[in-house]
Amino acid sequence: MATTKPYRVLLYYMYTTIENPEEFAEQHLEFCKSLELKGRILVATEGINGTCSGTVEQTEKYVEAMNNDPRFAGIVFKIDEADEHAFKKMHVRPRSELVTLRLEDDINPKEITGKYLEPKDFYEAMKQEDTVIIDARNDYEFDLGHFKGAIKPDIESFRELPDWIRENKETLEGKKILTYCTGGIRCEKFSGWLVREGYEDVSQLHGGIVTYGKDPEVQGELWDGQCYVFDERIAVPVNQKEHVIVGKDHFTGEPCERYVNCANPECNKKILCSEESEAKHLRACSHECRVHPRNRYIVQHELTEEQVAATLEKIEAGK
């Protein structure tokens, strides 16, 4: 493959035993900094989950070091080309679990997990009858892009998913269940939990949406919108054949794929909105957030009280 861009973004995870996550995190942070990588890596006794960016040479050194560590034998890196770093800083943090499911009786994906489907098999499975496609991500991730026909669970975070499944048991019983997430790590646990709950036909997209979008055969087909990623890029394309925008401007309902955080720091909700809507509504998701004394948009643009009042008046008048 011809090298066209100077940077690489690595996305990876592995369920493996790490004896002392705190000590490992400290040492790993120093190692990443020595390579001048930037990113966010989570470490737990159950394994590692990371995204980091650097030059081709820096990321190659990192991949080599990880492959040479027996704990990470067989780890798979999903690699994107980039023009620059995808992060501002480098963080390696110890956690109690890699993905926040907070089950009383935790799932070990090395012992129980759903069937792995490669992109082509997942593509075929999505078209079968009696199949339910469950998006295992957060609501704002779904709103930016998802597989055609996928169910959006009425939840705000991953840890609410088991309760939602239990509440919708009648709809799901007896169906073939397909589940997917960004890179695969959430589905490893979630699909295992579904199996433990008694669902017999549970499959997961191996390698997640990112792998599906790069597959030369399916080329991201049946995906609408873009894939939300947790770095400075915010979104990456998936469907190589056609681009359908499913995101909608929070204020106008117009097609939109531009995410911003609500300007109220106490809210910080992710909202899809155009630059025009952002200015018109002071980058705030509600009236309460617009008039919040710490509204970051007002501070950033040094708006006077008169300017803010005029903006609020226009909104009130529906202009």
From Swiss-Prot:
Function text: Catalyzes oxygen-dependent 5-hydroxyuridine (ho5U) modification at position 34 in tRNAs.
GO molecular function: oxidoreductase activity, acting on paired donors, with incorporation or reduction of molecular oxygen
EC category name: oxidoreductase
Keywords in alphabetical order: Oxidoreductase, tRNA processing
Taxonomic placement: Bacteria, Bacillati, Bacillota, Bacilli, Bacillales
Official protein name in the record: tRNA uridine(34) hydroxylase
CDD domains: RHOD_YceA (cd01518)
NCBIfam families attached to this UniProt entry: PRK00142.1-3 (NF001135)
